[in-house]
UniProtKB/Swiss-Prot annotation:
Enzyme class, spelled out: hydrolase
Record-linked InterPro entries: Acylphosphatase, Acylphosphatase-like_dom, Acylphosphatase-like_dom_sf, Acylphosphatase_CS
UniProt EC number: 3.6.1.7
Protein name as annotated: Acylphosphatase-2
Domain of life: Eukaryota
Keyword entries, A-Z: Acetylation, Hydrolase
Gene name in the database record: ACYP2
Provenance organism: Gallus gallus
Active-site residues (renumbered): R28, N46
The reaction(s) this protein catalyses: an acyl phosphate + H2O = a carboxylate + phosphate + H(+)
């Protein structure tokens, strides 16, 4: 299957948790901004364990770009030690209409 076919026909969903210095550094705001730029949907929130967690859905190539951003970039003041992805699957439709911060 060509990359073009995969990009246009396949929707993905993935859960994530980001570890490191990711709270109190505008991580959620930058995550929401990046998601909107890429055109993916889902959510982000702080956890009581000091991590940031959430879910991303969208075309496979856009979800992969967001995974890369969550693993390597983050907000300017953040320090990402590691990012754990789970429950990655192909979906038939999006569960969200936008990207939001949860509290």
């Amino acid at each position: 299957m060509s990359a073009l076919t995969k990009a246009s026909g396949s929707l993905k969903s993935v859960d994530y948790e980001v570890f490191g210095r990711v709270q109190g550094v505008c991580f959620r705001m930058y995550t929401e901004e990046e998601a909107r730029k890429l055109g993916v949907v889902g959510w982000v929130k702080n956890t009581s364990q000091g991590t940031v967690t959430g879910q991303v859905q969208g075309p496979e190539d856009k979800v992969n770009a967001m995974k890369s951003w969550l693993s390597k970039v983050g907000s300017p003041s953040s320090r990402i030690d590691r990012t754990k992805f789970s429950n990655e699957k192909e979906i038939s439709k999006l569960d969200f209409s936008g990207f939001s911060t949860r509290y």
